[in-house]
Amino acid sequence: MATGETGIIGKGIVIKGNLTGGGDLVIEGRVEGQIALKNHLTIESTGKVQADIRAEELTINGEASGNIDASSRVAINASAKVAGDIKAPRVVIEDGAVFNGSIEMDVRLPDDI
């Protein structure tokens, strides 16, 4: 997928395996395996993902189980259920979201702290 394109995995679709790509991806269905994207991944409220995820940015409205490594940002919205460890420089968890795991934010602190 070329940069700038968005792929959609619809509500009735189940994918088992590895997903890789350079564009954005929206998951409304179910994915099991591993996901590696160069851009933005969105898991919609109907989406269920059981996978380790690597992406630039991740927005979760549905369910995700597995470790997450984002180079930019992870947003866990109020309707989301997430189980797994997160590594990202910025993480947002909205009130109402369910999260079970650990968060590692690789942020450089000033020397005087």
UniProtKB/Swiss-Prot annotation:
What GO terms fall under cellular component here? cytoplasm; cytoskeleton
The organism's place on the tree of life at top rank? Bacteria
In terms of one coarse class, where is the protein primarily found?
cytoplasm
Q: What is the lineage of its organism?
A: Bacteria, Pseudomonadati, Myxococcota, Myxococcia, Myxococcales
Question: What's the encoding gene here?
Answer: bacN
Q: So what does this one do?
A: A non-essential component of the chromosome segregation machinery. Positions the ParA-ParB-parS chromosome segregation machinery within the cell; BacP seems to be the most important bactofilin in this process. Forms a heteropolymeric, subpolar scaffold in the cell; BacP probably forms the core, BacO contributes to position and integrity while BacN does not seem to contribute to assembly.
> Which keywords, in A-to-Z order, does the entry hold?
Chromosome partition, Cytoplasm, Cytoskeleton
Q: What happens when the gene is disrupted?
A: BacP has nearly wild-type localization, only minor changes in ParA or ParB-parS location, no changes for PadC. In a triple bacpN-bacO-bacP deletion ParA, ParB-parS and PadC are mislocalized, nucleoids are more compact, DNA origin regions are mislocalized, DNA content increases. The triple bacNOP deletion is synthetically lethal with smc or double scpAB deletions.
One of the GO BP terms on file = chromosome segregation
Database matches in Pfam families? Bactofilin
Q: Which species is listed as the source?
A: Myxococcus xanthus (strain DK1622)
Q: Partners and quaternary state? A: Interacts with BacO and BacP, the 3 proteins colocalize as an extended structure.
Q: Which Gene3D superfamilies match?
A: 2.160.20.120
Q: Does the keyword Endoplasmic reticulum apply?
A: no
Can the keyword Cytoplasm be found in this entry's annotation?
Answer: yes
User: Transmembrane region positions?
Assistant: none
What family is reported?
A: Belongs to the bactofilin family.
Which subcellular locations apply to this protein? Cytoplasm, Cytoskeleton
Q: What is this protein called?
A: Bactofilin BacN
